[in-house]
Amino acid sequence: MFSNIFSFDRNFYNKGFYPVAGIDEAGRGPLAGPVVAAVVILPKDSAIPYLNDSKQLSEKKREILFEIIKETALDYAVELVNNEIIDEINILQATFLAMSRAVLKLKTQPDLYLIDGNRKVHGLSFNQETIVGGDAKSACIAAASILAKVSRDKMMLEYAKQYPVYEFEKHKGYGTKKHIEALKKHGICPIHRLTFSPVNDIISQTKLNI
């Protein structure tokens, strides 16, 4: 994995694309909190140990790599779109918006953007390549996945202090059994996504019971 993940990006360098940026997001599925996107440009000779898809790493390894990536990257940016905008424009468009905002924060203009998934970022005229499962194939996408994931987790830890009854520190807003039980018991808080099920179901049920 260590060798292959960097070899994947080098294939693009060898075709004349450099620098290359990886884009990924964290937080499309949760019932609460923002969606976060990150974009990362790594040096040609980058060789970060244990770099992989953030979902395949322990929390401790992600946090260590988070700092290494920020120190190693030629450029990077992280942006978010909050739950209110997610409800207004839908999660897919909110994800594109977060990615667009992150791209526009870069000081370095890449020759190519590698995007995790099968959808290009709408509204951007830059050269884009979609990579299904890219966070496990491409070093720069894997790096972006880690920055996005750790950044979002840190935000959710802060929200956990504001809204302790939901225990966001444990599930980061995902729809775990404990989270749904807390929703049913305490209702929603300001960072819940009102258009997501079962949040909207719980809201409807609460209205019926009034």
Swiss-Prot record:
What EC numbers are recorded for this enzyme? 3.1.26.4
Q: How is the cofactor bound?
A: Manganese or magnesium. Binds 1 divalent metal ion per monomer in the absence of substrate. May bind a second metal ion after substrate binding.
Cite the RNase H type-2 domain residue spans from the record.
18-208
What coarse category fits the chief subcellular location reported for this protein? cytoplasm
Asked whether the UniProt record includes Cytoplasm among its keywords, one would answer yes
Which Gene Ontology terms cover its molecular function?
manganese ion binding; RNA binding; RNA-DNA hybrid ribonuclease activity
Keywords from the UniProt entry: Cytoplasm, Endonuclease, Hydrolase, Manganese, Metal-binding, Nuclease
Subcellular location, in the record's words? Cytoplasm
Please state what class of enzyme this protein is: hydrolase
Q: Which reaction does it catalyse?
A: Endonucleolytic cleavage to 5'-phosphomonoester
PROSITE patterns in the record, alphabetically? Answer: RNASE_H_2 (PS51975)
What residues does a divalent metal cation bind to? 24-25, 116
Task: Please list the cofactors this protein needs.
Answer: Mn(2+); Mg(2+)
Which GO cellular component terms are attached? cytoplasm; ribonuclease H2 complex
**Can you tell me which family this protein belongs to?**
Belongs to the RNase HII family.
Which PANTHER family does the record match to this protein? RIBONUCLEASE H2 SUBUNIT A (PTHR10954), RIBONUCLEASE HII (PTHR10954:SF18)
What this chain does, per the entry, is described as:
Endonuclease that specifically degrades the RNA of RNA-DNA hybrids.
Protein's UniProt name: Ribonuclease HII
Species of provenance: Endomicrobium trichonymphae
